[in-house]
Amino acid sequence: MGLKYLVWMCTRAEEYEYAFSLGGGKPLSEELTSEEAKKLFNAAADFGVENLFITGGEPLLRKDLLELIEYASAFGLKLYVKTKGWRINEEVARKLASSNCKVIVSVAGLEKVDDTLRGEGAFKRSINAASLCSKQGILYSLSVMNTKYVVNQVRDLVGLALKLGSEGFSLECLIPRPVHIEEQRVKLVPLEPTPEEREKELNELYLLSKQLGGRIRITPYDMQYNRVLKTKEPWLTLRGRCEIRNNLEADEWLEVLDDGKVYCCSPLGLAFGDVRRNPLDDVMERVRSSDLVRKLADRINIKGKCRICEFNGICGGCRARAYVYTGDMFASDPACPYRPATFTV
């Protein structure tokens, strides 16, 4: 018993609407209340959750967030909050540190890109927050949303994370959540890097991880990175990055959205319960017994080049990205430029 990762999107509220906002950046009227959030933390502790990630929207727009984090810390959960950081000052950073809560500060790129996508002054506010968190020893990661605008900024962004004293750097994928999907497609598709640009980024991050020799944890959240690793270092034994598949082997990952629904893969819309009504162990049992989850986890069911790819076992392509951009969750990952030797159109 025990879940490695529980992610709670506590609100979709934002200071204002921008490129990555959900539902116009307005909070949902039925988001979990303070008491319901505390019940979720109780349930998480009972279920043996190791890592609790709190995301948004902008989590710090919840007036009860610091109180909730302090409450959760009493259970010994490893806590992380992902934020733009605009509402972090010295006092907030100290309070987060006192609750042993690590902070992931998100930016959309270097200053010009970040200010273009998130508003003038956005970058400086986020970097100031990162510096304050670093001084408290709680800067877990500098997180960057992967768009076509950061393709040539990866090296400088990793360097910035190092300069800030961050434990890590992560590159996130632009994959819509299961709300306002059509609206998100309109906003996000034009921002996507091409498959070739994505390949360039992943190879650059591999080189940086070797050059920096463990000075910083570099995490590209992309299924294809396993293929890059295996190509560079064939002797490596790698585990697949698909949480759908991993949930069948162990209690790996669940995501709770602001309305309380629980997903094993939110972009696919695979909800298996509601924290207001369903215990987490019941939710996980539903995940494991789902015919669709088992079908998705069995890579023999994937279509196109992903099915015959020699890296199928450690990659298999992102099922969510296939679904969002092709309408078929079993289709080949449209973001991958790799062509298996046996593939013919």
Predicted segments, located by residue:
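Conserved alpha-helical substructure of the radical SAM core
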Residues: M1-S99
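Short loop/turn motifs at secondary-structure junctions
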Residues: G2, E17, G48-V49, S99-N100, ...
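A structural signal for isolated positions on well-ordered beta-strands in alpha/beta enzyme cores
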Residues: V7, F53, Y80, I104, ...
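Residue-level signal for the nucleotide or nucleotide-sugar donor/cofactor binding architecture
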Residues: L32, K63, G121, Y149-N152, ...
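Flexible loop residues that form catalytic
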Residues: G57, A108, L174, I314, ...
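Radical SAM enzyme [4Fe-4S]-AdoMet core and its adjacent flexible, acidic
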Residues: S99, S106, K112-D259, Y263-N278
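Accessory C-terminal segments flanking Radical SAM cores
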Residues: D222-F343
